[in-house]
């Protein structure tokens, strides 16, 4: 293409993404948009088409972002090229959203006509505003009997401050309003700015590993043009490669001769090493490089850590490969090797939240067929010692001796919880039980309230979300951001089985709830650990003080079965002999801890 053709094509490109709270219908809307623009034949169409992982389709949530190019003939008779970048809505996957938005000029904001605005709707809108996107409100599910589009329209104006007078009323399920949405995209979303003659700048917003073609980078071209055969350089790592193919997604990968300004597509360059392409990096030409890289997005820091260990220790290297491949596709995952006396060799992994942790675990078990044991999740604590030094602890078993600790600080989050009026009391109770501090309460309208609390992250990690949902019948929605560290009275609790410490069961807990927590765990382990041939004491200790104890009784054979008659000395001899044997066994016996016991420690309720 020459310069004029490229400029004309650029003016017809529209890049947009769809943002919404979970379950407000954005994957269905994406399906309808694909149908409307005839991206696929009827035969290829299936529900939640862009959710390509089995896991996504099963749970009905979007985890990965996805990109697709569509051709749309608008009412003005012109052909437009639309790039739809689908995004997840769950709070753990905000980084996926921020990456999608960095590649767009506009966003469709989907709001459920019955439920109205929810916490993550707001969080995603603020992300979109940070990226200066044009936001088009769409009120979805208007065919529901409980829909109240006018109230929701008012809410969008009051809470978010967007002009909702032209908001499209739609039902993705019934296919109502899809054309209006496409027309609004063409009219209101600006065409990409950039110059195809400038030095090349492409932003990598995702990548995946193909065993035949190496690493495939998903890119958005900001300036310049990239063709097959070009020599390109990754600006962060300085590595150079020759481009073997470029193309777009129509959802299938379709090869093209070149990608130019505004295009969203993929680039393969026989990149074998996973570490050479970093999401957020800029690709430029090796011969005529750009002066500086694009402003990538900030690296997200993991908030939750846990240990992953293969049940079969021979598969340690397979687990490393699995984590490396997932890291490529999931820029927020971090991991490093660690060892545990109880579990052998494994990895300490960092995640954005509990859902993220569960998803990674499931993906390893499904896609790589590795059975895992996971340890209790923990957050990063700052420990200040009496000798003036300080250290960072992300694994409870690294916590120093209590005598040497001056103070411990833990991360706090500011949680915004949106909830119907009737459940305000229930939510406040949960937050107080989780050591939360009340900050603020605002009424959105007659029926809904936003509560703001400061809560320690470690309390949210356990089961905060589950409790919130079950005590508000699923109506509460919640979003959080890190605000920093504050001192807390924290202690490390160890679990001893048969007087031996099991390092994988250690956890850090607030001093006030230590006793109750210890008692619950000890009882729980008593149920879950199978009975042995000798009796096994289970103790919860803080330092050298035992705070709770329970005993698993020994299994024993009835040694008196063959005695008839009543001679007590004969029976006594047999019983004493048995007791002696049990005692010997106890001194050498070791106790196997089943995986359920580790899981129970995770899922433990404080009540």
Swiss-Prot record:
Residues at which GTP binds: 23-28, 140-143
GO molecular function per UniProt: GTP binding; GTPase activity; ribosome binding; translation elongation factor activity
Protein name, per record: Elongation factor 4
Origin: domain of life: Bacteria
Localization (cell): Cell membrane
Pfam family, one: GTP_EFTU_D2
UniProt keyword list: Cell membrane, GTP-binding, Hydrolase, Membrane, Nucleotide-binding, Protein biosynthesis
SUPFAM superfamilies per UniProt: EF-G C-terminal domain-like, P-loop containing nucleoside triphosphate hydrolases
Species whose genome carries this gene: Bacillus cereus (strain AH187)
Gene Ontology BP annotations: positive regulation of translation
Catalysed transformations (reactions): GTP + H2O = GDP + phosphate + H(+)
tr-type G domain: residues covered: 11-193
PANTHER family per UniProt: TRANSLATION FACTOR GUF1 HOMOLOG, CHLOROPLASTIC (PTHR43512:SF4), TRANSLATION FACTOR GUF1-RELATED (PTHR43512)
Principal localisation: membrane
Membrane association type: Peripheral membrane protein
Family, per entry: Belongs to the TRAFAC class translation factor GTPase superfamily. Classic translation factor GTPase family. LepA subfamily.
Function: Required for accurate and efficient protein synthesis under certain stress conditions. May act as a fidelity factor of the translation reaction, by catalyzing a one-codon backward translocation of tRNAs on improperly translocated ribosomes. Back-translocation proceeds from a post-translocation (POST) complex to a pre-translocation (PRE) complex, thus giving elongation factor G a second chance to translocate the tRNAs correctly. Binds to ribosomes in a GTP-dependent manner.
Annotated PROSITE patterns: G_TR_1 (PS00301), G_TR_2 (PS51722)
Gene Ontology cellular component annotations, sorted alphabetically: plasma membrane
Stored CDD domains: EF4_II (cd03699), EF4_III (cd16260), LepA (cd01890), lepA_C (cd03709)
EC number(s) reported in the record: 3.6.5.n1
